[in-house]
Amino acid sequence: MFLAGSFIVLCGLLAQSTAQLAGLPYPLGQDLPMSMGHCRSLHVGQTLPYYGVTPVVSTYPSDHLDRNFRDAFRHGLLSGGILSFLEHIPLLNYVRPTGSNAGGLVGVLGKVISSIPLLNNILDIRVTNPQLLEIGLVQSYDFHRLYVTIPLGFDLRVNTLVVGSLLELSVKLDVTAEVYAVRDSYGRSRLVIGDCIYPPGSLRISLLNRLGPLQNLIDSLTDILTRVIPGLVQGVVCPLVNGVLSLLDVTLAHDVADALLRGVQFVIKT
């Protein structure tokens, strides 16, 4: 029996590739992103894949491997500036109708927005209190892949033309990244990102204060935010995930990659 902490690193150092951490995925005037680069979106209704492979029975002693991976993943996202990126997403640019001072989107969504004059009453939208909640980790049925759930939360403060009317909204949503291991022709293993998706239905927007006279505006704003936020957040998070994988501790990355390549279960269900 081999202890996870005592593996000799035979595969050498993982390449320390530099991840381009972009604040916003696309400039105004382009359609909202559904994926970044190699981060592909799942179709609506598509579930995480089942590979139909019988799990490998192993005594690989990896009691703390899942916890260490989650902790390192969380630290990487935070040190990579995920909260700052969320806080500086200029949502107003994507919500105000085309032709307003703040600009707007083109395409189908832009036409929908421009047909809602109530949105002209919005003066400013600020993201406050961004949070990275507890990261979830699930292994595929064949134990060769990981699905990392990145739960995010933040509040929105919306200033309107109506004097004394400040809307406060709470937003929560998940981004799920698929992680698997590959081995090159020299036998060196590394972790790579597969699909990086916004699971449909994970977005939750709730009103923190009650403003009856503005209910129509609230309904219109919530509808637009539901369409806009997932693509923007996904465009921020997915490149960061790729950067986190490339900068993981070498020993931890090797142990996780080795376990996945062997098809060893190490994620402890709680």
From Swiss-Prot:
Tissue localization of expression: Expressed in interpapillar epithelium of the anterior part of the tongue.
Molecular function via GO: lipid binding
Cysteine disulfide links: 196-238
Localization per Swiss-Prot or TrEMBL: Secreted
Keywords tagged on the record: Disulfide bond, Secreted, Signal
A GO cellular component entry from the record: extracellular region
Annotated signal peptide: 1-19
Known role: May play a role in innate immunity in the oral cavity.
Family, as annotated: Belongs to the BPI/LBP/Plunc superfamily. Plunc family.
Protein name, per record: BPI fold-containing family A member 5
Organism of origin: Mus musculus
